[in-house]
Amino acid sequence: MTQKTNSILTPDMKAMVGKTGEKVDAWGVVDEEYLRRFAQAIPDWDPLYWDKDLAQKSKFKGLTVPPLLPTYIVTRRALSEKDQMDEVMVQDPMNDGGMNSGGGTRSQKGMLPRLPLPPHIKRHLHGGDDVEVHQYPRMGDKITFQRKYTSIQERIGGDGKPFLVARSETTYWNQKGEVLCKVGTIDIRR
């Protein structure tokens, strides 16, 4: 005998597919300091990022930067902008700043509207990312990004309880409107 479950995927949630966050211009441009910090963090010491002669002879015909650098740049804030994590940490010093934290990255510009989840759905699991690189960013590029929901599906877990799989995509452009990369993200809600 199979257990009958009530669907948690409501018409309001289905209507979220295709919804977008605001289109946002990142603060600053791709520069040597962003490159240095990102290359040290991942670590990636490709000489195409700093050796002008070698880079000029490459297929890129000049210096380039790691293809995922736009995903880092958009998290930066101008010094004049309030950091929302300050307030979150006062309220809850153990907060990790995650998407369900009531602050932190959720308050970042360009975020998607919150899913209208039932009250019993409280857990969030990052299900992974996939990346589609169109072209490498260049020094001086001004990055713009926008997120959108691409699908929201209901699944049944091994315990017989329903959960949601929400997929979103973030597109990153340069100042010429050329797509640099697209990052698909899977979020699991239980």
Indicate residue ranges for each PLM-predicted region.
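Hot-dog-fold acyl-thioester-processing enzymes
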Residues: 2-128
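HotDog/MaoC-like acyl-thioester-processing domains
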Residues: 1-23, 125-190
